[in-house]
């Protein structure tokens, strides 16, 4: 059954997305989730979620508020460890290694798997010091190395041309959209393998949102990206693959064009056509 007529104006014009047909089975796996459940105390928030996140692609998580998409995202760098009473059952394998095994270096994991949150959170420091923050923590202090990293990361975050003449000004003087791109620069400066974006545009105006979306497309040549978004138009524009979640369960996961135009599950169709959520 075709559902093209029911996408309710969702713009499927991807940001330069490769037009060849995508297939999860043919992708290199970056993150393997072989049956994950998560509890906050007695309350179960994720129910036996299984999926493979492909390397150097953009994967979007969509679903109504409270469906578990941000909770799942935060398992990928163990941010949920910071929540009292949080308990995970199952494994998450990052390039074949279980990140929940005993003795895992969580600080190193969070360097390898960087995260950007909804609200831009630059530090009250200069633009330069924001970008090199993680490098300094690693003990890197040689000026030439830091200078090169700042230019590389700001260019990577499409911010260099806007700030190159004021690197020693406060980051708090930047616009919201610039601050979010600075946070992305700070995150990629330590050269992670995976970027987690938790509704990164929800606090931004449309023009800033477009810049961040274009940036996401550029960054996937270097990083595996997973984005949580409440905006289905955004998921359709920026992602290669989309996962639809509902009440802590993974309902459907596949290439974005197919999921939005010809979903396999009625629950998915009902959500993307606005019947609920």
Swiss-Prot record:
The record's GO molecular-function terms, alphabetically, read: ATP binding; ATP hydrolysis activity; ATPase-coupled phosphate ion transmembrane transporter activity
Query: Can you state which reaction this protein catalyses?
Result: phosphate(out) + ATP + H2O = ADP + 2 phosphate(in) + H(+)
PROSITE patterns named among the record's database cross-references: ABC_TRANSPORTER_1, ABC_TRANSPORTER_2, PSTB
Under Enzyme Commission nomenclature, its number is: 7.3.2.1
Q: Which residues cross the membrane?
A: none
> Has the keyword Nucleus been applied to this entry?
no
Statement: the UniProt record of this protein carries the keyword Transferase: no
Assigned keywords, A-Z = ATP-binding, Cell inner membrane, Cell membrane, Membrane, Nucleotide-binding, Phosphate transport, Translocase, Transport
Question: What's a GO cellular component annotated to this UniProt protein?
Answer: plasma membrane
Q: What Pfam families does this protein's entry cite? A: ABC_tran
- Tell me where it resides: Cell inner membrane
Q: How does it sit in the membrane?
A: Peripheral membrane protein
Question: Which superkingdom heads the taxonomic lineage of this protein's source?
Answer: Bacteria
InterPro entries per the UniProt record, alphabetical: AAA+_ATPase, ABC_transporter-like_ATP-bd, ABC_transporter-like_CS, P-loop_NTPase, PstB-like
ABC transporter domain ranges (all copies): 31-272
Q: Which CDD domains match?
A: ABC_PstB_phosphate_transporter
Annotated GO biological processes are: phosphate ion transmembrane transport
> What's this chain's function?
Part of the ABC transporter complex PstSACB involved in phosphate import. Responsible for energy coupling to the transport system.
Oligomeric state and interaction partners are given as: The complex is composed of two ATP-binding proteins (PstB), two transmembrane proteins (PstC and PstA) and a solute-binding protein (PstS).
Family under the similarity heading: Belongs to the ABC transporter superfamily. Phosphate importer (TC 3.A.1.7) family.
Identify this protein by name: Phosphate import ATP-binding protein PstB
